[in-house]
Amino acid sequence: MSSTVSRRRFLGTTAAVSLAASTGQAAAPSDKIVIGVMGLSRGRSLADSFAKKPNVEIKYVCDVDSQRAASCADLVMGAVGKAPQAIGDFRRILDDPDVDALVCAAPNHWHAPATILACQAGKHVYVEKPCSHNPQEGEWMVKAARTHNRAVQMGSQRRSGETLQKAIRMLHEGVIGRVYSSRAHYYSLRGSIGTGAPAMVPEHLDYELWQGPAPRTPYMDNRVHYNWHWFWHWGNGELG
């Protein structure tokens, strides 16, 4: 992806493209849902969980860090006796007509681009929270899902939990009367990530693809993997 393409320009273009919507996909020969998992920090756990479902086949595990991709492939192999393909570019998943859905657990700045491209490729999507890096991207994702008739689900586990659904339903039913205001607080005890220092990009990391549509910045030793959360180019802090 060209370093001269801004994330707004990239997403605006992909959201506006009108491709012929696929109204259905042929079932896989095994009658299983064939998926590819992108982003293998949180995605490693998701791949393990999905692989153990009797009606799911993990065909690809994808990460720009080749070591993580290989490790996750070994994990799935150990769980079900069949290794998925370990790849570095998620677009290979989208190009495969046998794949039904993309599971996107990549950093936040990739959620919208990957989801939109997957919808355009005729894939359904499960995307980790937050669904997008900013509200505008969320609108583009909704448009892509509707245009291409794809199912897109955001994995907000607490929102989908039975207990919280019951609580919200009771609020809507007026159990405590009209709600005028609410307050929420979130505290997490975290150590400092330091200021970081310029470093050579590890051979096993495709840092160019990791940055994707985000502004280009030099590689630092305190960002990849998890600490990208604390930089606005890629994350949303404690909010996301």
Region spans (language model):
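Glycine- and other small-residue-rich loops at beta-strand/loop junctions that grip anionic moieties
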Residues: 39, 104, 130, 156, ...
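Active-site-proximal cap/loop segments of hydrolase catalytic domains
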Residues: 61, 76, 138, 164, ...
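Active-site/binding-pocket entry motifs
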Residues: 67, 188, 216-217
